[in-house]
């Protein structure tokens, strides 16, 4: 996580938020699925915490099982009780609860997210635009119509 104010005033917090829901239509319980002995949400959280551009990282959930795991393992977690259709909705609700100048939405099912990708996104962010996305170029035609690739 960030140790000094780079590109921002010291009071400008950069916050990583990781939406994590239990009732996924494709894979219920995905945040707590075991990946080589470690739940997915732990892997995502740990990788996000490696991003030097982030001051704080929070898991956002509507599920007590995920919250309980996070509390037992010293992971910052916030229960979002409002009905949210998407992870982005959950992040929008969290903005009302958290202090920060810039919020980075980190997908809860990216256990191998590269912390440097987060750093590059934060560093390149243009405050006059308001929103930025990191992405990977799709090179195979079939991936354009695959609902599992977003």
Labelled PLM ranges:
Residues 36, 81, 135:
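Residues at the C-termini of beta-strands that transition into short coil/loop
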Residues 58, 64-123:
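Short phosphate-binding loop-to-helix
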Residues 2, 7-61:
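N-terminal glycine-rich phosphate-binding loop and ensuing alpha1 helix
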Residues 13-15, 102, 131:
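Residue-level preference for the first positions of well-ordered beta-strands
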Residues 54, 100, 127-131:
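Short, high-confidence coil segments that cap the C-terminus of an alpha-helix
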Residues 19, 105-107, 134-137:
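Short beta-strand segments
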């Amino acid at each position: 996580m960030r140790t000094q104010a780079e590109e921002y005033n010291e009071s400008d917090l950069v916050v990583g938020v990781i939406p994590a829901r239990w009732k996924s239509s494709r894979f219920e319980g995905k945040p707590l699925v075991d990946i080589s002995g470690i739940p997915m949400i732990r892997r995502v959280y740990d990788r996000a915490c490696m991003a030097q551009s982030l001051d704080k990282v929070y898991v956002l959930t509507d599920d007590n099982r995920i919250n309980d795991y996070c509390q037992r393992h010293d992971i910052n977690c916030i229960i979002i009780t409002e009905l949210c259709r998407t992870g982005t909705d959950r992040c929008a609700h969290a903005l009302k609860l958290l202090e920060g100048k810039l919020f980075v939405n980190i997908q809860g099912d990216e256990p191998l997210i590269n912390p440097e990708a987060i750093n590059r996104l934060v560093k390149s962010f243009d405050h006059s635009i308001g929103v930025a996305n990191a992405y990977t170029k799709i090179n195979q035609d079939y991936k354009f119509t695959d609902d599992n690739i977003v």
